[in-house]
A protein has these predicted regions:
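Short, contiguous pre-domain boundary segments
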Residues: 6-20, 176
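Non-catalytic accessory segments flanking enzyme active sites
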Residues: 18-62, 66-67
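A broad, structural surface signal
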Residues: 30, 34, 38, 81-84, ...
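Short Pro/Gly-enriched beta-strand edge/turn motifs at strand-loop
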Residues: 38-49, 120-124, 308-312
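Rieske [2Fe-2S] iron-sulfur-binding domain
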Residues: 49-154, 158-168, 172
Length: 371
C-alpha cells in the first residue's frame, strides 16, 4: 500500500516545477528574510535552558541574533542581541546566567528585562540619554511543549493561531515534562530548504535507510495537511515494512524494546505482525509500574511515530517517551549554507509514580491477606 494523503485545500494549487533559484539565489534568500523569517513563529530553544532567574541563551538566525532570558521577576523575555547605542552585538556567549547584559564596546548595561540601567560617564551626553528609547528591542516569545518560540513580527498571529489544531494533537505527549538529553548543531553546505525537503518525506527511506524496514512501515504512512503549511505524518511502529517479505522471527533491532516490556521474542516466531498491538497492551498494562503515565495517549501513540513538519523550518518527531526537534537555519549570506540542529528530549521514568504503583499493589496484597 502506498502512503495515504488526507487534506483539503480551499483553492486548487497547480503543480509546477521548482527552479534551482529558490535554493541558490541571494535575491530569493533576501525575500525569505522579509516574507518568512520575519513573520513566522520559530523554535528558538528549550524551556529548561531558562528556568532560573538570570538564565539566558542566544538564538541565531542570520543575520538576526536574539537573547531569550528569564528576568529577575521570573518573566520570560526575548530581545534582539544588539546594543541600542552603536548597534554592537551585546552578548557573545551562547548561554549563561546574568543579572544584566554589558556591551563590550562602551560598557552600557541593560537589565535582563531589557531596561537600560547604566551609561558610563552619562554626564558627557549634553542632551541626556533617552533610556526608554534605548532599552533593548523586544521580540515576542512564548513557552509551549517544553520549547521556547519567538516571532519577530509584533503584529502577527499568536502562537496558538500559528499552530492551529496541531497544538491539541501534541499536548497529550506531555513534552514539557521531558528532559533534554541531546543537543547537536552542524554546518551543512546546502540550502536550508534542501534539508527540510529531505526530512519532510519518507520516499527515500527504503533506499537510504534499509535498516528501518525492520522498525516501522513507511509505505502505509498517512500524510495530513493543515492551514499554514504544516503537515502531519503517521507511521506504524513496532512492525516491518509491508513491501518486504515478512520475517519469521522478530528482527534483532526490536529485541531490547520487547525485553524492556517483559515480552519474549520467541513468542512471536511466525507472527511478528502481532508485536505492535501487544506492545500497546503491555505499555498500557505496565506503564505506571515502569514510571510512565500513558493515560493521555491513544493506543496507536504507544507504538507509532508521529511527525509534524511545521512551516517553515522545524520537524517535530514524537513517540510515547521521546521527542525530536529538527531545525534548519540559514547561515550567513550564502544561500548554499545552513545550520542543522537536532534536539532530543526524553521522558525519564517517574520514581514517584513507580512507588505509588508499588504501594497500591502492596496495599492490595495486604487486603487480600486480611480477607
Amino acid at each position: 500500500m502506498s502512503s495515504q494523503q488526507v487534506g483539503t485545500f480551499e483553492n486548487e494549487i497547480p503543480f509546477k516545477r521548482i527552479t534551482s533559484e529558490r535554493y541558490l539565489s541571494p535575491a530569493y534568500m533576501e525575500l525569505e528574510r522579509e516574507k518568512i523569517w520575519g513573520k513566522m513563529w520559530l523554535v528558538a530553544g528549550v524551556e529548561s535552558d531558562v528556568v532560573e532567574r538570570g538564565d539566558y541563551f542566544i538564538f541565531d538566525l542570520d543575520p538576526e541574533s536574539i537573547i531569550v532570558c528569564r528576568t529577575e521577576n521570573a518573566d520570560l523575555r526575548a530581545f534582539y542581541n544588539v546594543c541600542q547605542h552603536r548597534g554592537n552585538k551585546l552578548v557573545a556567549q551562547q548561554m549563561g546566567c546574568l543579572e544584566r547584559f554589558t556591551c563590550p564596546y562602551h560598557g552600557w548595561q541593560f537589565e535582563n528585562d531589557g531596561a537600560l540601567s547604566k551609561v558610563p560617564e552619562e554626564h558627557r551626553f549634553s542632551a541626556g540619554v533617552p533610556r526608554d528609547e534605548l532599552s533593548l528591542k523586544a521580540v515576542r516569545v512564548e513557552a509551549w511543549a517544553g520549547l521556547i518560540w519567538v516571532c519577530m513580527d509584533p503584529q502577527g498571529p499568536t502562537l496558538s493561531q500559528y499552530l492551529g489544531p496541531i497544538k491539541e494533537m501534541i499536548e497529550p505527549f506531555q513534552t514539557a515534562k521531558m528532559a533534554l538529553v541531546e543537543d547537536q548543531a552542524c554546518r551543512l553546505n546546502c540550502n536550508w530548504k534542501a534539508v527540510i525537503d529531505n526530512f519532510s518525506e519518507l520516499y527515500h527511506v527504503e533506499h537510504i535507510h534499509p535498516q528501518h524496514e525492520c522498525i516501522f512501515d513507511c509505505p502505509t504512512s498517512k500524510q495530513e495537511f493543515f492551514p499554514g503549511g504544516h503537515t502531519r505524518v503517521l507511521i506504524d511502529g513496532f512492525t516491518v515494512n509491508t513491501n518486504m517479505e515478512i520475517p519469521e522471527e522478530v528482527p534483532r533491532i526490536q529485541w531490547p524494546q520487547l525485553e524492556a516490556l517483559g515480552m519474549e521474542k520467541e513468542d512471536y516466531r511466525g507472527r511478528i505482525l502481532d508485536v505492535r498491538r501487544d506492545v500497546q497492551i503491555k505499555k498500557r498494562q505496565f506503564g505506571k509500574a515502569l514510571g510512565y503515565d500513558y493515560d493521555l495517549l491513544s493506543d496507536d501513540q504507544l507504538s507509532d511515530i508521529v511527525q509534524y513538519n511545521l512551516f517553515p523550518n522545524s520537524v517535530l518527531v514524537l513517540q510515547a517517551e521521546e521527542f525530536w526537534i529538527l531545525r534548519a537555519r540559514p547561515r550567513g549570506e550564502d544561500p548554499n549554507a545552513c545550520y542543522w540542529d537536532k534536539l532530543v528530549m526524553r521522558m525519564l521514568p517517574d520514581d514517584d509514580l513507580k512507588s505509588q504503583v508499588s504501594d497500591e499493589r502492596r496495599g492490595a496484597n495486604n487486603t487480600a491477606d486480611i480477607r
